[in-house]
Amino acid sequence: MTNSSPRPSGRRADQLRDVRITRHYTKHAEGSVLVEFGETKVICTASVVERVPEFLRERGQGWLTAEYGMLPRATHTRSDREAARGKQTGRTQEIQRLIGRALRAVFDLNALGPRTLHLDCDVIQADGGTRTASITGAFVAAHDAVTKLVAAGKIARSPITDYVAAISVGVFGGAPVLDLDYDEDSACDTDMNVVMTGAGGFVEVQGTAEGVPFSRAEMNALLDLAQAGIGELVRLQRAALEA
């Protein structure tokens, strides 16, 4: 696919930013990753907690949950820490719930046993697509954490049933494009976030028109772009885990 209106980055319409997944990025967490989508950089850690929420007590199954945050100067201007304000924004709550839903879609929580896998996604630099980068990186961190559980004999098998990754797509300059950076995201006509499994199943589709409604044909084109992009992200996840 080509784009008659050049992207600010010079990328093709169907081209991801440079994606890097660096495992074992921090020392203490059972799984840790630095994931980079171009200039967007997120540290994702996976921590094993040997207890479950009260609503799962005595059921014998596990739980997976996520938290998301941004450093004060992850963006162009400084923002106060949410802890200093004493309240999470609606955006933060929405994103961390999305990350949790995305990962739970590919986890057999019964196989995890009575413990919680806690994912923390901290944005150290934001240039668009922080939630999609967080999901993609958090999966790799979670994979490393459960691999350690299996190796330690705490669980009999991996609870992971498939890969999961996420990407943004949108209509920019009148054409569908893949993996929006900040310049594109702030000026696009349509913005959509797509979460899919390695097998091609949809976990979540979030799409919004920014003043100019999009057609069914445009939506189909966006989903096709997203599916191809997520296929490439899954390939990169596999390569990182096999390294």
From Swiss-Prot:
The keyword RNA-binding applies. Its EC number is 2.7.7.56. GO terms for biological process: rRNA catabolic process; rRNA processing; tRNA processing. Keywords: Nucleotidyltransferase, RNA-binding, rRNA processing, Transferase, tRNA processing, tRNA-binding. It catalyses: tRNA(n+1) + phosphate = tRNA(n) + a ribonucleoside 5'-diphosphate. It comes from the Bacteria. The keyword tRNA-binding applies. Phosphate binds at residues 91, 129-131. Gene3D superfamilies: GHMP Kinase, N-terminal domain (3.30.230.70). GO terms for molecular function: 3'-5'-RNA exonuclease activity; tRNA binding; tRNA nucleotidyltransferase activity. InterPro entries: ExoRNase_PH_dom1, ExoRNase_PH_dom2, ExoRNase_PH_dom2_sf, PNPase/RNase_PH_dom_sf, Ribosomal_Su5_D2-typ_SF, RNase_PH, RNase_PH_bac-type, RNase_PH_CS. Phosphorolytic 3'-5' exoribonuclease that plays an important role in tRNA 3'-end maturation. Removes nucleotide residues following the 3'-CCA terminus of tRNAs; can also add nucleotides to the ends of RNA molecules by using nucleoside diphosphates as substrates, but this may not be physiologically important. Probably plays a role in initiation of 16S rRNA degradation (leading to ribosome degradation) during starvation. Homohexameric ring arranged as a trimer of dimers. PANTHER family: EXOSOME COMPLEX COMPONENT, EXOSOME COMPLEX COMPONENT RRP41. Belongs to the RNase PH family. This is Ribonuclease PH. It comes from Burkholderia thailandensis (strain ATCC 700388 / DSM 13276 / CCUG 48851 / CIP 106301 / E264). The gene is rph.
